[in-house]
Regions:
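Bacterial N-terminal signal peptides
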Residues: 2-10
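Serine-dependent protease modules
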Residues: 15-236
Length: 236
Protein backbone atom coordinates (compact mmCIF):
# COMPACT_ATOMS: atom_id res chain seq x y z
CA UNK A 1 0.00 0.00 0.00
CA UNK A 2 2.83 2.38 0.88
CA UNK A 3 4.62 1.54 -2.37
CA UNK A 4 1.42 2.13 -4.38
CA UNK A 5 0.84 5.48 -2.66
CA UNK A 6 4.43 6.51 -3.34
CA UNK A 7 4.04 5.63 -7.02
CA UNK A 8 0.80 7.59 -7.27
CA UNK A 9 2.37 10.63 -5.61
CA UNK A 10 5.42 10.35 -7.86
CA UNK A 11 3.25 10.13 -10.97
CA UNK A 12 1.20 13.08 -9.77
CA UNK A 13 4.33 15.18 -9.29
CA UNK A 14 5.60 14.24 -12.75
CA UNK A 15 2.23 15.17 -14.25
CA UNK A 16 2.38 18.56 -12.56
CA UNK A 17 5.91 19.15 -13.89
CA UNK A 18 4.86 18.11 -17.40
CA UNK A 19 1.76 20.30 -17.22
CA UNK A 20 3.83 23.27 -16.04
CA UNK A 21 6.41 22.71 -18.77
CA UNK A 22 3.69 22.47 -21.42
CA UNK A 23 2.00 25.58 -20.06
CA UNK A 24 5.23 27.57 -20.15
CA UNK A 25 6.05 26.44 -23.70
CA UNK A 26 2.48 26.97 -24.81
CA UNK A 27 2.33 30.55 -23.54
CA UNK A 28 5.63 31.96 -24.81
CA UNK A 29 3.97 33.07 -28.05
CA UNK A 30 1.27 34.92 -26.14
CA UNK A 31 3.85 36.55 -23.85
CA UNK A 32 6.09 37.58 -26.74
CA UNK A 33 3.16 38.97 -28.72
CA UNK A 34 1.93 40.95 -25.71
CA UNK A 35 5.42 42.35 -25.26
CA UNK A 36 5.73 43.66 -28.82
CA UNK A 37 2.12 43.89 -30.02
CA UNK A 38 1.43 47.39 -28.59
CA UNK A 39 4.36 48.72 -30.65
CA UNK A 40 3.16 47.28 -33.98
CA UNK A 41 1.44 49.80 -36.27
CA UNK A 42 -0.46 49.83 -39.54
CA UNK A 43 0.87 52.21 -42.18
CA UNK A 44 -1.41 53.63 -44.88
CA UNK A 45 0.12 55.62 -47.72
CA UNK A 46 -1.19 57.76 -50.52
CA UNK A 47 0.37 59.34 -53.58
CA UNK A 48 -0.94 61.20 -56.58
CA UNK A 49 -0.22 59.52 -59.89
CA UNK A 50 -0.94 61.03 -63.28
CA UNK A 51 -2.58 58.56 -65.61
CA UNK A 52 -3.32 59.29 -69.25
CA UNK A 53 -7.00 58.68 -69.88
CA UNK A 54 -6.75 58.45 -73.68
CA UNK A 55 -4.25 58.00 -76.46
CA UNK A 56 -3.90 61.49 -78.00
CA UNK A 57 -2.78 60.01 -81.34
CA UNK A 58 -6.23 58.45 -81.76
CA UNK A 59 -8.13 61.74 -81.37
CA UNK A 60 -8.77 64.39 -83.99
CA UNK A 61 -6.15 67.19 -83.62
CA UNK A 62 -8.84 69.87 -83.29
CA UNK A 63 -10.53 67.95 -80.49
CA UNK A 64 -7.17 67.31 -78.82
CA UNK A 65 -6.40 71.03 -78.83
CA UNK A 66 -9.81 71.71 -77.33
CA UNK A 67 -9.37 69.16 -74.54
CA UNK A 68 -5.83 70.27 -73.78
CA UNK A 69 -4.60 68.53 -70.61
CA UNK A 70 -8.03 67.41 -69.48
CA UNK A 71 -7.20 63.91 -70.64
CA UNK A 72 -4.56 63.58 -67.92
CA UNK A 73 -6.06 63.41 -64.45
CA UNK A 74 -4.22 62.65 -61.20
CA UNK A 75 -5.39 59.59 -59.30
CA UNK A 76 -4.84 58.67 -55.68
CA UNK A 77 -2.83 55.48 -55.36
CA UNK A 78 -3.08 53.90 -51.93
CA UNK A 79 -0.77 51.42 -50.24
CA UNK A 80 -0.63 49.64 -46.93
CA UNK A 81 2.01 48.00 -44.77
CA UNK A 82 3.19 47.52 -41.21
CA UNK A 83 5.82 48.99 -38.92
CA UNK A 84 7.16 48.79 -35.39
CA UNK A 85 7.87 51.60 -32.92
CA UNK A 86 11.45 51.30 -31.66
CA UNK A 87 11.78 54.16 -29.16
CA UNK A 88 9.72 56.47 -26.98
CA UNK A 89 10.17 59.37 -29.41
CA UNK A 90 7.90 57.57 -31.87
CA UNK A 91 10.40 56.36 -34.45
CA UNK A 92 8.85 53.64 -36.60
CA UNK A 93 11.00 51.12 -38.44
CA UNK A 94 9.45 49.78 -41.66
CA UNK A 95 10.31 48.83 -45.25
CA UNK A 96 11.47 51.41 -47.75
CA UNK A 97 9.12 50.00 -50.38
CA UNK A 98 6.16 50.74 -48.08
CA UNK A 99 6.79 54.50 -47.76
CA UNK A 100 9.11 55.64 -50.56
CA UNK A 101 7.81 58.17 -53.09
CA UNK A 102 4.51 58.74 -51.28
CA UNK A 103 2.77 62.03 -50.53
CA UNK A 104 0.98 61.13 -47.30
CA UNK A 105 1.64 58.64 -44.50
CA UNK A 106 -0.94 57.71 -41.88
CA UNK A 107 -0.01 55.51 -38.92
CA UNK A 108 -2.62 53.59 -36.93
CA UNK A 109 -1.42 52.70 -33.44
CA UNK A 110 -2.36 49.53 -31.57
CA UNK A 111 -4.78 51.55 -29.42
CA UNK A 112 -6.64 52.73 -32.53
CA UNK A 113 -5.28 56.28 -32.57
CA UNK A 114 -4.34 57.55 -36.03
CA UNK A 115 -1.30 59.82 -36.38
CA UNK A 116 0.36 61.60 -39.26
CA UNK A 117 3.69 60.08 -40.19
CA UNK A 118 6.74 61.84 -41.58
CA UNK A 119 9.29 59.85 -43.57
CA UNK A 120 12.74 60.66 -42.19
CA UNK A 121 14.67 58.55 -44.64
CA UNK A 122 14.62 55.47 -46.84
CA UNK A 123 17.35 53.13 -48.03
CA UNK A 124 16.18 51.22 -51.11
CA UNK A 125 19.29 49.02 -51.10
CA UNK A 126 18.52 47.55 -47.67
CA UNK A 127 14.76 48.20 -48.03
CA UNK A 128 14.55 49.93 -44.64
CA UNK A 129 12.97 53.25 -43.68
CA UNK A 130 12.32 55.39 -40.62
CA UNK A 131 9.03 57.18 -40.05
CA UNK A 132 8.37 59.69 -37.25
CA UNK A 133 4.92 59.78 -35.73
CA UNK A 134 3.80 63.04 -34.19
CA UNK A 135 2.91 61.71 -30.77
CA UNK A 136 5.54 62.41 -28.13
CA UNK A 137 6.57 60.08 -25.30
CA UNK A 138 4.91 57.01 -26.72
CA UNK A 139 5.56 54.40 -24.05
CA UNK A 140 4.96 51.23 -26.08
CA UNK A 141 8.05 50.46 -28.11
CA UNK A 142 9.62 47.16 -29.02
CA UNK A 143 12.95 45.94 -27.63
CA UNK A 144 15.54 45.10 -30.28
CA UNK A 145 17.25 41.73 -30.19
CA UNK A 146 20.47 40.56 -31.81
CA UNK A 147 19.96 38.67 -35.06
CA UNK A 148 23.58 37.50 -34.83
CA UNK A 149 22.45 35.14 -32.07
CA UNK A 150 19.88 33.37 -34.25
CA UNK A 151 20.15 29.71 -35.11
CA UNK A 152 18.23 27.65 -37.62
CA UNK A 153 15.28 26.08 -35.82
CA UNK A 154 14.73 28.98 -33.40
CA UNK A 155 11.15 30.12 -32.94
CA UNK A 156 10.07 33.04 -35.14
CA UNK A 157 6.90 35.09 -34.62
CA UNK A 158 5.62 37.49 -37.28
CA UNK A 159 3.39 40.43 -36.35
CA UNK A 160 1.67 42.89 -38.64
CA UNK A 161 -1.43 43.80 -40.60
CA UNK A 162 -1.72 41.41 -43.57
CA UNK A 163 -4.48 42.52 -45.94
CA UNK A 164 -5.25 45.29 -43.43
CA UNK A 165 -6.07 42.78 -40.66
CA UNK A 166 -4.55 44.43 -37.61
CA UNK A 167 -2.92 42.61 -34.68
CA UNK A 168 -2.23 39.43 -36.65
CA UNK A 169 0.30 37.01 -35.13
CA UNK A 170 1.76 33.95 -36.87
CA UNK A 171 4.26 31.39 -35.62
CA UNK A 172 7.06 29.50 -37.33
CA UNK A 173 10.76 28.84 -37.09
CA UNK A 174 13.93 30.27 -38.55
CA UNK A 175 14.22 28.08 -41.65
CA UNK A 176 17.52 29.46 -42.91
CA UNK A 177 19.97 32.30 -42.33
CA UNK A 178 21.99 34.50 -44.71
CA UNK A 179 19.67 33.83 -47.64
CA UNK A 180 20.98 35.96 -50.53
CA UNK A 181 18.22 38.23 -51.85
CA UNK A 182 19.82 38.15 -55.32
CA UNK A 183 18.87 34.48 -55.56
CA UNK A 184 15.24 35.61 -55.24
CA UNK A 185 15.48 37.89 -58.26
CA UNK A 186 16.30 41.23 -56.58
CA UNK A 187 19.61 42.21 -58.17
CA UNK A 188 19.34 45.84 -56.98
CA UNK A 189 19.39 44.88 -53.28
CA UNK A 190 22.29 44.00 -51.02
CA UNK A 191 20.84 41.81 -48.30
CA UNK A 192 21.14 38.42 -46.73
CA UNK A 193 17.79 37.51 -45.27
CA UNK A 194 16.25 35.44 -42.52
CA UNK A 195 14.03 32.77 -44.06
CA UNK A 196 11.01 31.68 -42.03
CA UNK A 197 7.91 29.56 -42.44
CA UNK A 198 5.87 31.92 -40.25
CA UNK A 199 3.01 33.11 -42.47
CA UNK A 200 3.84 36.45 -44.11
CA UNK A 201 1.34 38.02 -46.51
CA UNK A 202 0.82 41.33 -48.35
CA UNK A 203 0.50 44.01 -45.68
CA UNK A 204 3.02 42.31 -43.38
CA UNK A 205 5.84 44.25 -45.05
CA UNK A 206 7.62 46.39 -42.47
CA UNK A 207 6.26 44.49 -39.48
CA UNK A 208 8.55 42.82 -36.95
CA UNK A 209 9.79 39.27 -36.79
CA UNK A 210 10.42 38.52 -33.12
CA UNK A 211 12.02 35.76 -31.08
CA UNK A 212 10.52 33.82 -28.18
CA UNK A 213 11.74 36.50 -25.75
CA UNK A 214 9.69 39.19 -27.46
CA UNK A 215 12.64 40.94 -29.11
CA UNK A 216 12.71 42.21 -32.69
CA UNK A 217 15.13 40.12 -34.75
CA UNK A 218 14.04 41.17 -38.23
CA UNK A 219 11.73 43.27 -40.40
CA UNK A 220 9.43 41.26 -42.65
CA UNK A 221 10.04 42.26 -46.24
CA UNK A 222 8.75 39.75 -48.78
CA UNK A 223 7.08 36.41 -49.39
CA UNK A 224 7.73 33.98 -52.19
CA UNK A 225 4.54 32.07 -52.92
CA UNK A 226 4.01 29.02 -55.06
CA UNK A 227 2.69 25.47 -54.82
CA UNK A 228 2.28 24.59 -51.17
CA UNK A 229 3.19 26.96 -48.34
CA UNK A 230 4.81 30.32 -49.05
CA UNK A 231 8.31 31.24 -47.94
CA UNK A 232 8.73 34.37 -45.84
CA UNK A 233 11.82 36.55 -45.59
CA UNK A 234 12.89 39.21 -43.09
CA UNK A 235 15.73 41.72 -42.94
CA UNK A 236 17.96 40.90 -39.93
Amino acid sequence: FIIICFCLVNLSQKSEVLALTYSENHNFVSSAAKNVGPAVVKIDTERLVERQQFDPTLIDPLLRDLLGEQGIAPERERGQGSGVIINEQGLVLTNAHVVEKVDNVSVTLANGNICDGRVLGTDPVTDLALVKIEESNYSSFAPLGNSEDLEVGDWAIALGTPYGLEKTVTLGIVSSLHRDINSLGFSDKRLDLIQTDAAINPGNSGGPLINSNGEVIGINTLVRSGPGAGLGFAIP
